[in-house]
């Protein structure tokens, strides 16, 4: 039996980040957390590209375009969708979630889902590091680990 475990090492990796401008007071915090975590784990600052989009619904297509360039080893999707009084929240959350999963599987590229889907502004702020923890930073670490475990699987397959 073979066990594959990924290490958190960003040396030599090129990372794309798509981030929604809507609810920027939250998404900027997520972005900062992701960038700082990537650099802390060995990704060169110049190897991190950020694409700002109007809202979360625009993230999947932008991520797909980023991946199509073949410049990125993996991508992080960041946004904050906060429930309002209408069904709009449900449609946006469903669309962005399905879109990101579809792009990841279709392109065989890891995309970390850092789109917060919360009932309140306070919940979004908590998850963006205003109190503790930052889902952007968590996504960065998860992406590096996922990329490493995928490399290990491919390496074993080639052996």
From Swiss-Prot:
Biochemical pathway: Cofactor biosynthesis; riboflavin biosynthesis; riboflavin from 2-hydroxy-3-oxobutyl phosphate and 5-amino-6-(D-ribitylamino)uracil: step 1/2
Provide the catalytic activity annotation: (2S)-2-hydroxy-3-oxobutyl phosphate + 5-amino-6-(D-ribitylamino)uracil = 6,7-dimethyl-8-(1-D-ribityl)lumazine + phosphate + 2 H2O + H(+)
GO BP: any one term: riboflavin biosynthetic process
Q: What GO CC terms are in its UniProt record?
A: cytosol; riboflavin synthase complex
What keywords tag this UniProt record? Riboflavin biosynthesis, Transferase
List the SUPFAM superfamilies.
Lumazine synthase (SSF52121)
Instruction: Name the CDD domains on file.
Output: Lumazine_synthase-I (cd09209)
- The keyword Phosphoprotein belongs to this UniProt entry's keyword annotation: no
Enzyme active site: 88 (proton donor)
Binding residues for 5-amino-6-(D-ribitylamino)uracil: 22, 56-58, 80-82, 113
- Which is an annotated GO molecular function term of this record? 6,7-dimethyl-8-ribityllumazine synthase activity
E.C. numbers = 2.5.1.78
Name of the protein in its database record: 6,7-dimethyl-8-ribityllumazine synthase
Organism encoding this protein: Lactiplantibacillus plantarum (strain ATCC BAA-793 / NCIMB 8826 / WCFS1) (Lactobacillus plantarum)
